[in-house]
Amino acid sequence: EFVDTDMNWNFETVPQAIIGNQTKSLRAGKTLGGSTSINGGAWNRAHKVQYDMLKNITSDPTFDFEHLQEYMNRAESFVPPTKEQRKAGADYVREAHGYDGPLSIGFSPIRNKQKRMFTGEGQQAFLETIQRVLGVAHLKDQNSGNNTGAGWTPTSISQDSKRESACRYLEQT
C-alpha cells in the first residue's frame, strides 16, 4: 500500500471545531486504480453536484451524474448486503450499482472481521447519535449521488481478498 508515500493525495479537511479544531485526512490514490490501491478498498463516489459541474466545465451535456453513472455502474458487480448486514443497518439503492462488471463490490465479510463492521450495536448507535446530536443524515447508499451524511461504505474486497480496480481491469486484457 502507498498510504504514507507521495502516491497519496492525502487531502486534509479544514479544522473541525466540533473535535477541538483537529483536521482529518482523506486518502486518495495517484495510482492506476486510484484510491482502491491505498485506502482499504472503500468504494465511494463523489456527490452528484460534483459530477454535474463537469458538464459546465466541458460544455458537454453527457458529462453529468446521470450519464456518467451508467459507466460507473459498468465497473462493478455489486453484491447486496447479507441478511445479517441489513439487520445491522447496511443498505443500498439498487439503481446506484452495476451487477455485471469486473469489480466485486459489497459489504465484505473479511472487512467485517478485520474492522469489526456490522458486528454489534455500536455501528447503528453511532449513526443514530450523530444524527440526533449533530444532525448528520443517515445515508441509505453513499454511491447514489448524495454522500452528504454517514452510512456504511461498500468495498472492493471480495469474499477472499482486496482487489484494486487496476488489477481487475488489467487481468482482463
Summary of predicted features, one role per range:
Residues 1-173:
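N-terminal redox-cofactor-binding region of secreted/periplasmic oxidoreductases
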